[in-house]
Amino acid sequence: MSWLKRTTGRMRRGRVVAAGNRGVDDAVTAHLTDFARTRRGVEAYVEPQTSVTQVTLLLVAYDGEWTRRVVPSPQWAHAFAESLQIPGYDAAVVGYPQRMRDYNTRNKKHPDLR
């Protein structure tokens, strides 16, 4: 019960910021841009907000290497992908590419090859 009191108390005092009102940190934008520009075959997957996570943008390169960052909205994520001229997909609709799972499996079996 104390968690509920702490949470509602924060919301009343205005400390909690709605996800849509939050800007994007320059470091996040720089990281995503750098990832997309320094790797081949990058695709963007927009992950919807859930009860435990905010909207995220997942970038996956041709070899399965990936990076994920929190973004303000699905619209922002799609506009970002379009600005970099990379394809953008809704992850809830199309799922994740097999190459990403293969990349994770390779790195678990041989972490020294990263």
Outline where the language-model segments fall.
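Intrinsic disorder
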Residues: 1-114
